[in-house]
């Protein structure tokens, strides 16, 4: 589930669908969703008598910061995370622009706090000066079992990955 103005719904060239999934959209406001809209969407989904025959909302997607340059506040992210926890749906934070979000004067979230406000996020490297790489962070007990074979099967496991690691140590 993503905001209709969110990156994954508009600017990912169908990457989610290419992998066999579907992006379900709710109203978006400059790239952001509101917790109330998310709760209403999920409530309506379960009230539908034939919900078992429709696409199940399997994750919630937000960007920090959005392509519009907007930021989620700690309170907004906490409210969305609360809906996700209540409904047992993981919250994924797209952190392609996370370095810029965390550096913004308006941002009231720290990196450790972000880890408490979602289930998985990633830290984009290339948009903040790295030559390549993104770091996926699984929070709490949400890490998948045996991730390396899955990464390798998708052609995303870099040889000499230590070179990528060094950049993240320097940047974050």
Predicted regions and their residues:
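Active-site-proximal loop->helix
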Residues: 11-21
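Active-site C-terminal subdomain of aminotransferase-like
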Residues: 56-58, 63, 71, 110-172
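Conserved PLP-anchoring active-site segment centered on the Schiff-base-forming lysine
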Residues: 1-10, 39
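Short beta->alpha connector loops at strand-helix junctions that form conserved
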Residues: 3-4, 25-29, 125, 158
